[in-house]
């Protein structure tokens, strides 16, 4: 029976994303969120490269889970995925306190996974997040290219002082948040540029081992902002 640990799944995710042309990744991130495409890319890679046997298979949207490795009707591995811009991870409100914050999105995925895990306790469960940014400061006319969330990218760069600061701080915030949920791996995505604007992105993968503490939001807030 297939078993994949955190390091193996992270390495397979990294290998699957390396197959994407950096110019294509830049286009995807500049023109909108792309968690669906990245989910499909990972799913295809797992389906091709896992040593599946018998009734084992990879599927999407089983019981509304993003990606699942199954043995017949039994889930073995479940993965949920989200995508956010750097400016979201940079700001305390969007990172933690808003009703539609990164934290709330992650918590919702964790609760859904734990509910399924209660029914299938032998399954391994994971959450993932892509954090990406477009350096709109490199092109004063960025609005001409209809960058999705272009104004938000620009506000984040201005707030952080420059694009490098924005990427670094948002990466640190996302690392702390993910690490609070469980063992975490991170790797950069090889994104190129879009009409002269550099694109940066990171992939975070966390294995959920236990239920989050009731005070987790405050613990994350204290770790980052206090």
Predicted regions and their residues:
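Ampiphathic alpha-helical segments that act as solvent-exposed interaction surfaces
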Residues: 2-11, 98-111, 202, 208-226
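Non-catalytic C-terminal interaction segments of nucleic acid-processing enzymes
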Residues: 140-226
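Short, well-structured alpha-helical interface segments that form or flank functional binding sites
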Residues: 33, 37, 41, 62, ...
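Hydrophobic, Leu/Ile/Phe/Ala-enriched alpha-helical segments that form helix-helix packing faces
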Residues: 13-20, 42, 46-50, 110-120, ...
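Long, charged, glycine-rich C-terminal linkers/tails
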Residues: 54-69
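Catalytic cores of nucleic-acid endonucleases
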Residues: 83-144
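Conserved catalytic cores of phosphodiester-cleaving nucleases, focusing on short active-site segments
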Residues: 67-69, 73-89
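Acidic-basic catalytic patches of nuclease active cores, encompassing PD-(D/E)XK
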Residues: 1-58
């Amino acid at each position: 029976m297939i078993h994949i640990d955190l390091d193996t799944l992270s390495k397979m995710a990294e290998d699957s994303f390396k197959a994407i042309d950096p110019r294509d990744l830049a286009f995807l991130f500049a023109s909108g969120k792309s968690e669906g495409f990245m989910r499909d890319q990972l799913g295809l890679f797992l389906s091709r490269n896992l040593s599946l046997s018998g009734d084992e298979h990879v599927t999407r949207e089983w019981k509304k889970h993003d990606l699942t490795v199954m043995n017949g009707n039994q889930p073995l591995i479940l993965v949920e995925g989200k995508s956010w811009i750097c400016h979201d991870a940079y700001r305390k409100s969007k990172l933690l306190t808003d009703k539609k914050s990164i934290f709330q999105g992650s918590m919702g995925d964790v609760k859904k996974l734990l509910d399924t895990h209660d029914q299938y306790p032998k399954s391994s469960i994971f959450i993932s997040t892509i954090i990406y940014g477009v350096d709109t400061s490199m092109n004063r006319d960025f609005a001409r290219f209809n960058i999705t969330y272009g104004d938000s990218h620009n506000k984040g760069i201005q707030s952080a002082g420059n694009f490098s600061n924005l990427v670094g701080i948002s990466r640190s915030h996302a690392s702390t948040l993910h690490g609070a949920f469980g063992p975490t791996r991170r790797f950069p995505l090889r994104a190129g540029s879009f009409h002269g604007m550099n694109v940066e992105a990171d992939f975070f993968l966390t294995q959920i081992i236990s239920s989050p503490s009731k005070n987790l939001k405050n613990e994350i807030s204290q770790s980052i902002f206090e």
